Amino acid sequence: MDGSELVEPTTKCPLKHGVRFHTSFGGRSNRDWWPNQLNLKILHQHAPASNPMPAGFSYAEQVETLDVEALKRDLAALMTDSQDWWPADYGHYGPLFVRMAWHSAGTYRTGDGRGGAGGGQQRFAPLNSWPDNGNLDKARRLIWPIKQKYGARISWADLMILAADVGMETMGFKTFGFGFGREDTWEPEEDVHWGAEDTWLGDARYTGERELDKPLGAVQMGLIYVNPEGPNGKPDPLAAAHDIRETFARMAMNDEETVALIAGGHTFGKAHGAGDAAHVGVEPEAAGIALQGLGWKNSFGSGVGSDAITSGLEGPWTPNPIKWDNGFFDTLFGHEWELTKSPAGAFQWTPKDPEAGPKAPDAHDPSRQVAPMMLTTDLALRLDPNYGPISKRFHENPDQFQDAFARAWFKLTHRDMGPKARYLGPLVPQEELLWQDPLPEPQGPPIDANDIRELKAKVLATGLSVPQLVATAWASASTFRGSDKRGGANGARIRLSPQKDWAVNQPAQLANVLATLEGVQSAFNGGQTDGKTVSLADLIVLAGCAAVEQAAKAAGHDVEVPFTPGRVDASQNQTDVASFGVLEPKADGFRNYLNTDLPLTAEELLVDKAQLLTLSAPEMTVLVGGLRALNANTDQSSHGVFTTRPGSLTNDFFVNLLDMRTVWTATSEDEAQFEGRDRTTGDLKWTATRVDLIFGSNSQLRALAEVFAQSDSQGAFVGAFVAAWTKVMNLDRFDLA
């Protein structure tokens, strides 16, 4: 018996000591039995039951009551309040907090917008136990007294970033600004794909000529960015530059921002590798209960201070590791470097002539002097043909370096927060930045209920069909990602590059629909005398709502789809084409669209899309069924349109999917497409994709489909569809929150 086998209870006391029962504390899960089972749990993360805050809690309201200056004073005092259980290097915790914040924010990747500092996920597994996050558990314990003091007025997620900002300010650096607004989560996020490897530092994520799997950003399991010793521990600076460029690009950083971030971060502090890594104990999630969530217990010497072991690399980068200056570039260019190994056996670089330049004090014994060191990834900033000139320019122009690092650091720590409108507090910089996806201010009074009725009638009189209007509104709104709060209908960027040319948006049809709606917009705006206007962003959504109402009426249901005006139209100058390119759907099961080589099934990609849209399983289900009934597939594909009355908002998709008179067979070896034939006659009735059939195959989704297929559920189906539709249309309306 391995301790996980089932033990049947007897008539005696069921709480047998030393015996593991099939409870929440043990036993096989469904995923253990069926590893390929569709994971719908990611649609129900962060449920209210997991949140300890009271009903109605508003973090934004709490931030308004926060004495920010008092908080910053307390953080500044903490920087030099060294604790015996984890002494501060050089008597200052600033560098440690910079690393904590960097590793909190640095998990962000552009491919799916997941990761980043929002939510404070560094507190939970797996991030709290990644090898690259070694000893950051101590950093979080050091700021706990401040979190305890200020309570709900500041989240862990905000505090971990602000601690680094204040730390840098106390070391002489002027930051660009800070936005509060990162709300804490209370459980690990299960939607983030960190990689398929089952060992720490595994790198099975590469194919071909070192092509990194999408959407991953880090080069190895358990690293934030790249291996500082070089690819797979090979100390090759030019090969390291390749990894750096790819990884930082997937964090939305260009070459200049990359150089600034690495050099700026390594201006502070030191690396820790005083002895053999064999002295280091297990990570926090594997540590014994008496350690109270702390990991990496070190048996080398005192285990702390001069005896600390974290990365295995050892030493400072600059002569003054707790002062903002140009010391990193002075050191990088001021020496010729030779390969060596740290006391822990890690590859790093040391000056060929250690007496040629200034040394740094020992981090815990000011009477001792130590030579600086560089990592393989640091030398890449000098030797790479693109990074090298940037580094040289920063070395010769410290003001440019300071500004570049301030801006890149602000971007790093705010990239997953969405538009500037979501930033809170008095430290938000005034400057508008292109990567924030800026929007213009609304002009004139908003349209009212009479205007809305008039515009609906005019749209429906244009001759545009229900599928055309629904598909356009969905295409506009469904770019939203709850991960990094980007995309959505506000801005009407569907009319701009690159969205207007995406294959999933049917460019030819889209151009016709937009031209027609622009005609309605122009006529309405031209007829106003009070400065009132309707934006195209609003009109696209309103047109979709009108189409849904018409489709519901055709099915016998009079409904009013909620609509709130207030969207604005962004310009092409406010839209970074490359930045928005990552939002292009390679798969959208709601439109039965699939054009990707990702190693995932169509149904897995549907669930992933639904999670990014913050949808629950019932919301995902009703939207797929409704959009099929509305005939809103890309390129008017008939797959999944299980109805003889397309364009009417019926529950026919569910009724016909669950009809046992239909037999389904695959029409391709990869089982991507299917045909449904009459069980008796063999006549072809329907065609479908995996996305369609999963609602009859997966037991949980079938249970939901059965609800919507019931004879008494037609009205409830329409109501549920309208509610889910409205939610998607308003996902980026942060002004309505």
Swiss-Prot record:
Tell me which InterPro entries the record gives: Catalase_peroxidase, Haem_peroxidase, Haem_peroxidase_sf, Peroxidases_AS, Peroxidases_heam-ligand_BS
What does this protein's UniProt record list under function?
Bifunctional enzyme with both catalase and broad-spectrum peroxidase activity.
Q: What is its EC number?
A: 1.11.1.21
Instruction: Tell me which HAMAP family the record gives.
Output: Catal_peroxid (MF_01961)
Quick check: keyword Oxidoreductase in the entry?
A: yes
Q: Which UniProt keywords apply?
A: Heme, Hydrogen peroxide, Iron, Metal-binding, Oxidoreductase, Peroxidase
Family recorded in the similarity comment = Belongs to the peroxidase family. Peroxidase/catalase subfamily.
Q: Tell me if Iron is a UniProt keyword of this record.
A: yes
What GO terms in the biological process aspect are recorded for it? cellular response to hydrogen peroxide; hydrogen peroxide catabolic process
Describe the processing and modification events after translation.
Answer: Formation of the three residue Trp-Tyr-Met cross-link is important for the catalase, but not the peroxidase activity of the enzyme.
Q: Which part of the chain holds the cross-link Tryptophyl-tyrosyl-methioninium (Tyr-Met) (with W-102)?
A: Y225-M251
CDD domains to which the protein is assigned, alphabetical: catalase_peroxidase_1, catalase_peroxidase_2
Cross-referenced Pfam families, in alphabetical order?
Answer: peroxidase (PF00141)
Q: Which GO terms describe its molecular function?
A: catalase activity; heme binding; metal ion binding
In Swiss-Prot or TrEMBL terms, this protein is called Catalase-peroxidase
Gene name of the encoded protein: katG
Q: How is the cofactor bound?
A: Binds 1 heme b (iron(II)-protoporphyrin IX) group per dimer.
